[in-house]
Amino acid sequence: MARLFLDDSFTLAKKVAEADIFIGFAPESAADWFAAVCAGGELISQGEGDLGARLTRLSGEVFALGYEKAILMGTDAPFLGANRLKETLRALKAPQTVVLGPAFDGGYYLIGLTEHLPELFDAIPWSSDKTLAETLKRVDKLGFKAHLLEIERDVDTPEDLKWMLDNWRQLDPNKSLSYHLSKSIQK
């Protein structure tokens, strides 16, 4: 299932023509596998630490290369569409903006940045129902504007996966279940 999520996320990112794609991967020993699966994307090791440390490292690497904006997204939001990435890019045209894609569980499935903000990710209660709320407080404290995308369901638990498998056909027709995953479910 994780491979299908990765395939779909990579395919989605490639649909956004104005984007270079970087793949944050772990563990280090999986570099060759990720290079083969995500041909055409640049690999960046996530390194060690909690999610905040890894997001800080990944965004820092991208901004150090001279990029003026970065979108970091997980591979566990199978209903995310290209229109959401395009909305994120439009919102990031405004300076000092942080774009967040809220998840139903209180976290977020995507974050877009206009600059490297290590303080944004420090001491956040990751994987909790307070992750988004605490991140929004931090955005405000740093003097940035938050742009919230439409809320989505991500797949973090067996219950989330069951919900997805039970309900994927009943979703809003403007949302599309990712290609590789939907083909697998139909089998």
Model-found features: residue ranges?
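Short beta-strand/loop segment that forms part of the nucleotide-sugar
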Residues: 18-27
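Short phosphate-binding loop-to-helix
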Residues: 33-69, 128-131
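Conserved alpha/beta core of the MobA/IspD/sugar-nucleotide pyrophosphorylase nucleotidyltransferase superfamily
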Residues: 133, 137-187
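Conserved donor-nucleotide/metal-binding helix-loop-beta segment in metal-dependent transferases, i.e.
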Residues: 80-105
